[in-house]
Amino acid sequence: MFAVSSRRVLPGFTLSLGTSLLFVCLILLLPLSALVMQLAQMSWAQYWEVINNPQVVAAYKVTLLSAFVASIFNGVFGLLMAWILTRYRFPGRTLLDALMDLPFALPTAVAGLTLASLFSVNGFYGEWLAKFDIKVTYTWLGIAVAMAFTSIPFVVRTVQPVLEELGPEYEEAAETLGATRWQSFCKVVLPELSPALVAGVALSFTRSLGEFGAVIFIAGNIAWKTEVTSLMIFVRLQEFDYPAASAIASVILAASLILLFSINTLQSRFGRRVVGH
């Protein structure tokens, strides 16, 4: 037996738990079970043949490379934006804070069309980058740009609350003891931010793995070059090859779950270490 706290916001523990479990079953477990059922139609040899297909492997490489570059960029830029929004007061700060959520509200197709227009050869950014012989559209770099744009809020919104709770007092105390601003950031602030920053980058990476709408507009679907796994899955579905689509999706799903589980484990160990101190 276990005791349930009497201070409840929602009426009824049984009703709340039942509703939550129903949501988990309908939204998470049923789709995953459908994926498993599709995979069950394939033998191990057929499954291996699908995921080891050279074109599929090329799509995995493009997807992982682009998602990695996008998540690293988001880690740096997202930390910078979170720092600016929490440590400084300036005109337009509220607007800038609201704009950080724009990728969440903007349809990915609209985001992709906008990015394609900006980075095209005649676009605002593309024309300038062309002077340095840098092409973004219909390259893996364009995929990374689309992924970074759609997933940047994960880093900002994960790091920002931690920075607000941390406050500038710790930095000021370190500086009064003789530390430079860079030393106070690296030795005082960054260790406290690391769990949130790593979690934000991991969420950005896993979100990027499944990006579809923005990618297809800025990078197209060029086999061996800009074909990512989400586009390949879409093509397989159009061909009514559901087992093959499920097999390709299962690899990305496994990678995402392993990454998220690893991050949660590291955060849990970090939390126990902090409590132990």
Q: What do these predicted ranges mean?
A:
Residues S184-F185:
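Conserved acidic donor-binding loop of glycosyltransferase catalytic domains
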Residues L177-G178, P191:
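Glycine/proline-centered hinge or cleavage motifs at structural transition points of membrane proteins
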Residues R8-S43, N52-E164, V188-G213, F217, ...:
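Membrane-water interface segments at the C-terminal ends of transmembrane alpha-helices
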Residues A173-A174, A245:
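Key positions in alpha-helical "signaling/recognition" and NTPase switch elements
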Residues A45-N52, A223-L237:
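Short hydrophobic, aromatic-rich alpha-helical segments embedded in or entering the lipid bilayer
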Residues M1-R7, W48:
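Membrane-topology segments of multi-pass transport proteins
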Residues T158-E172, T180-R181:
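Membrane-helix/interface signature in polytopic inner-membrane proteins
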Residues Q267-H277:
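Short cytosolic juxtamembrane segments of multi-pass membrane proteins
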